[in-house]
UniProtKB/Swiss-Prot annotation:
It is a multi-pass membrane protein. This is SPX and EXS domain-containing protein 2. Residues 1-339 form the SPX domain. Signal peptide: none annotated.
Length: 1053
């Protein structure tokens, strides 16, 4: 099993947002592979022509013999350079913004033969470089003045009489820019090709150029976009690193863990203080108060167990994610592991376990007579109760399925034709239908509580239920299934009774008492005033129903709104109840359209139908008066107002309309359609936030906060909501278009059931919406009110005052074997084990006694292993964080391997970029990299940079269809990528393809011998300015003198 699935299955629902975000950290690790490729600029390699390569090899072989002499010259010049180092060395950062850019002529195009030049013009390979016929024994220095558009406006000689200005410099620079632009355009076309054209072919030629780009297709995470300027200001968007995300996650878990522990300990201290309080107050030592203290110890012990499991689960996740990251970056992973081990999550002596042990000892000391085994059995979670309830639920579901099948079989067996059924059967169907609606609604609510618990929705907090009472969704569902089974049993009895056709009509008439007695019995059970049969739930329902009736004169809370919605869907129940009263009053039990009650035009009928909607409107008005918010309170009021108007118009049309389509009925139809559309729109916006907050909502078109991550759940719910809202229109169309009036009892039952289903779905998602819209819902909690709060407060104040007086105190020593207490004077007295014997009843078989002589030493919860937040702890954390940042910054320098910001090197790059780079770009940040301490020609002849501002991200669906090859967008200029033997300026290649074994192999990197470097070095070292004999002739202000006087440039290669 994968850890993310294990984490999901073992989360505590109320702490769901407080766990490690494992997927988030894993994504940060995955981004490490991509960041090395897309953070910086792309560098493209332009291969040399065969003639140029042969010339370079020839020059390298000829210059090998002169290397030793050049090295000796370097050694002789070291002393002179060292003496003048302080005066002639140019500091880093000087002249970086100058428009006069001084560069070695090695970077400039040199004179070549006409034949070679023509070839270059034809092939597009006119990269500025050292051609055949160039002198290897001298270096020319040119100063180029470049304007903002990259055009050369002035060329002057600054290196003395031996400096020679090359004729083709302007032409060569323009040709270089043209090649770069063509390369960029070609790459754009290659990336943006259709996925069907997978193969570009290894011999793909760039149009108008002779060089080739290897690859059989490009899989890239960048898009080289053609633009007027291939280079521009570099803008880097900072991305969150793994170490930052890891530290944030560790801090989140650590703070939540310690905070919850301290809150639990504070509650335990209060419970411990109640033990001597109850011991000293015999009047308050009741079963209820003792149960309160015992239950408090139970709950806190279980809470600490959950907290310990929370810690262990998060630690497993952190260690697993570190094991993954260690394969990529072991140094930072080691520091992150050190940071984790320095937190309070990895404390050796866990205060949580110590507090759990102390709670168990105190519980055994004062409630089980020092019986640790009995205390363990009483204080641990009793899972057998839930298992028993689940067994009962399964048994009742099976019994209900059998009863339903039996009812259907018997009815159609005894009455194959509906006309053969008893004359009073419509009345019986009515009675059974209206009695089943509240039962089904209550059972659906029990099922919803189970789903809310699974989804982590805190319905106890939303419904404002008392937190000191244990609730179980399985228990609710068990009660619901009991009523469903009883209803089916009564229904079976009625079907068996009416199937006896030998009975007289009077006898069959009395059979109506069967469903009627069941309804009366259910109502009596609901209002039963005794504390039996789920009395808390029954009293809560009656209390909320009374508050609905009192609206708008009482404050309205969410439970009151919930109860009003239940009454809305029970409108059919209220309407049928008034008809039952009418039938018994007029002795018309046939329940037919020709009966008295159907023809009766009592005004009470529409009033009872619209009464639930009126209560709902009054609740909305009250909420608007309290909050002043038009949405959603007045919005909901308008919904209910539509229902009131349509019900009144329907009653008027049925009783006073002369025609089938009178103007009243037409008005009713129009208002009903408009009202249904408005209700549907209100449902979508209030419950699901559909099409709201387009600019700021990341989850658009749904609301931003959702409990269920699968969006299809909400869309399915919207579909059902639309169907339930327009059921009336379907029924109306069938009745108007056909002769069938849809008055069959079974159809009416399903029609009523659709109202129940709508109400259940509406409440389910409204509670879910209320849950996610509460700020920090999981941190909201209600403290359990003390049953003796004022008395306990007075007792603690008196105890504190006695402590402040510092009276002499005798230490008592307990003898657990003989229940005697020895005081300081040597006398003894017996402890009083007060029980609840003075009460005329006992609740359970458990020992309800509490030790009346509580010892303060036994009740001490302090221990040596406590969580600390001292200055030393914070300093250790900050020290590790600083170490992680230092290592990360060092690795960033080593990974990019870019050109340093030495003024002359930086100016060289500016010459070919045609602009002054942004101060935030990566190049000015790269100072004093070890690779830059080598002789300058090694870097100057290596590459020119393509600006990252021309890079764009390719959509993921396009990347998935472009296989095999990748354009790396990072300019990893390390020595193995540099073409140090070429005196030309080139685009260095990091176009790479993945081998079958997963290793990245460079397709265009050329390994040159050491002679390549020596060849370039010889050209610099053989320059007269470098010669000691001509040292005095060199202008001290020349750029070349500033370079070669640095000690590190004169070191032997």
């Amino acid at each position: 099993m994968k850890f993310r699935d294990y984490l999901k299955d073992n989360k505590v629902s109320h702490w769901r947002d407080k766990y490690i975000d494992y997927e988030y950290l894993k994504n940060l690790i995955d981004n490490e592979y991509i960041n090395a490729e897309i953070l910086n600029s792309a560098i493209i390699d332009l291969p040399l022509s065969p003639e140029e390569q042969n010339n370079i090899n020839k020059n390298n072989n000829n210059n090998n013999n002169n290397n030793n002499n050049n090295n000796n010259n370097n050694n002789n010049n070291n002393n002179i350079n060292n003496n003048n180092n302080n005066n002639n060395t140019l500091k880093d950062g000087e002249q970086t913004n100058s428009n006069n850019i001084s560069i070695p002529n090695q970077m400039a195009p040199q004179e070549s033969s006409g034949e070679d030049e023509d070839d270059e013009n034809e092939n597009g390979n006119g990269v500025v470089g050292d051609e055949d016929g160039g002198d290897d024994d001298e270096i020319e220095m040119d100063e180029l003045v470049i304007d903002d558009n990259g055009e050369i406006i002035n060329i002057t000689a600054t290196a003395g009489s031996r400096v020679k200005v090359k004729k083709g410099i302007n032409k060569g620079v323009k040709r270089l820019k043209k090649i770069a632009k063509n390369t960029n355009n070609r790459l754009s076309r290659m990336v943006s090709r259709s996925p069907k054209n997978k193969g570009l072919g290894s011999s793909s030629e760039i149009e108008g150029d002779e060089f080739q780009l290897d690859g059989g297709g490009i899989s890239s995470q960048i898009e080289m976009v053609a633009s007027n300027n291939i280079t521009g200001a570099t803008v880097f968007v900072p991305q969150e690193t793994f170490q930052d995300g890891f530290i944030d996650q560790v801090n989140k878990v650590d703070i939540f863990f310690v905070d919850r522990y301290r809150k639990t300990k504070f509650k335990c201290v209060d419970l411990v203080g109640m033990i001597p309080f109850l011991s000293d107050n015999e009047q308050l030592r009741t079963i209820r108060n003792i149960d309160y203290v015992k239950q408090g110890f139970h709950d806190n012990y279980h809470y600490l167990e959950s907290l310990e499991s929370y810690k262990n689960l998060n630690l497993d996740g952190f260690y697993k994610i570190l094991d993954k990251y260690e394969k990529i970056n072991p140094r930072i992973a080691k520091e992150c592991r050190k940071y984790l081990e320095n937190t309070r999550l990895t404390s050796t002596n866990s205060p949580v376990r110590e507090l759990s042990r102390r709670i168990k000892q105190i519980y055994a000391r004062y409630f089980t007579g020092n019986d640790i085994k009995l205390a363990n059995n009483q204080i641990r979670t009793n899972k057998q109760v839930n298992q028993f309830q689940n067994y009962i639920i399964g048994f009742l579901i099976g019994a209900s399925a059998i009863l339903i099948a039996q009812v259907i079989f018997k009815f159609y067996y005894y009455f194959p034709d509906v006309a053969d059924s008893p004359k009073n059967s419509p009345m019986a169907w009515l009675l059974f239908r209206i009695s089943s609606l509240p039962i089904i609604l209550g059972t659906l609510f029990a099922l919803m509580t189970k789903l809310w618990e699974k989804a982590g929705i805190n319905y106890v907090f939303i419904f404002e239920l008392k937190p000191d009472i244990k609730r179980s969704s399985s228990r609710y569902l068990m009660y619901g299934m009991i009523f469903v089974t009883m209803w089916l049993v009564v229904f079976n009895v009625y079907v068996d009774s009416i199937s006896n056709k030998t009975g007289s009509p009077e006898t069959s008439r009395y059979l109506l008492l069967i469903p009627l007695l069941f309804i009366l019995g259910s109502i009596f059970f609901l209002i039963l005033p005794f504390k039996v049969l789920a009395h808390r739930t029954r009293f809560w329902v009656l209390h909320k129903m009374s508050k609905v009736v009192q609206a708008p004169f009482v404050p309205v809370r969410f439970p009151d709104f919930f109860m009003s919605v239940q009454l809305l869907c029970l409108g059919e129940f209220l309407f049928n109840m008034q008809q039952i009263v009418c039938m018994f009053k007029f002795n018309d039990p046939l329940y037919s359209p020709s009966g008295v009650c159907f023809k009766h035009k009592a005004v009470i009928f529409p009033i009872l139908s619209v009464l639930p909607f009126y209560w709902r409107v009054m609740q909305c008005v009250r909420r608007f008066w309290e909050t002043g918010q038009f949405f959603p309170h007045i919005t909901s009021a308008i919904r209910s107002t539509f229902s009131i108007v349509t019900n009144i118009l329907l009653w008027v049309a049925n009783n006073y309309g002369n025609k089938e389509w009178s103007w009243i009925k037409i008005l009713w139809f129009i208002i009903n359609v408009v009202g249904t559309v408005y209700k549907l729109y209100a449902d979508f916006t209030v419950d699901w936030g559909l099409f709201l907050n387009y600019k700021t909502n990341k989850q658009w078109p749904l609301r931003e906060k959702m409990v269920f991550k699968r969006k299809w759940v909400y869309y399915v719910a919207m579909s059902f909501d639309t169907f339930f809202r327009f059921v009336w229109l379907i029924v109306f169309s069938i009745r108007q278009g056909t002769s069938y009036k849809l008055d069959h009892p079974l159809f009416l039952f399903w029609f009523s059931l659709s109202e129940i289903a709508w109400a259940a779905q509406f409440i389910f998602f409204r509670v879910e919406s209320e849950h996610v819209q509460c700020a920090d819902t999981y941190s909201h909690f209600k403290d359990i009110p003390l049953p003796f709060s004022q008395d306990y407060k007075n007792y603690m104040e008196e105890k504190k005052s006695r402590y402040d007086e510092k009276k002499p105190h005798h230490h008592h020593h307990h003898d657990n074997n003989n229940n005697e207490t020895k005081d300081g004077s040597g006398g003894t007295h017996h402890r009083r084990n007060l029980s609840n014997g003075h009460h005329p009843y006992d609740d359970d078989d458990d020992d309800e006694s509490i030790d009346s002589d509580a010892d303060s030493k036994d009740l001490n919860l302090e221990s040596n292993s406590e969580f600390v937040d001292d200055e030393g702890y914070n300093q250790r954390k900050n020290s590790i964080i600083s170490s992680i940042k230092k290592i990360a910054s060092t690795q960033e320098l080593n990974s990019m391997n870019r050109i340093s910001s030495h003024p002359d090197l930086y100016s060289t790059m500016q010459r070919f970029a045609g602009h002054v780079p942004d101060s935030n770009s990566s190049m000015p940040r790269m100072y004093s990299h070890p690779d830059f301490n080598h002789p300058i020609p090694r870097v100057l002849t290596s590459h020119v940079e393509v600006n990252p501002s021309t890079l764009r991200t390719v959509p993921q669906h396009r990347l998935n269809n472009i296989p095999n090859q990748r354009i790396i967008s990072h300019a990893d200029i390390n020595p193995q990528h540099l073409r140090v033997g070429s005196p030309r300026v080139e685009f260095n290649s990091t176009v790479q393809q993945r081998s079958p074994h997963g290793e990245i192999q460079s397709s265009m990197i050329r390994n040159h011998s050491r002679a390549d470097l020596n060849s370039s070095m010889q050209r610099i070292q053989s320059h007269p300015e470098l010669n000691s004999s001509n040292r005095n002739q060199v202008d001290p202000n020349s750029p070349m003198n500033r370079l070669i006087t640095r000690a590190d440039l004169n070191k032997s290669r």
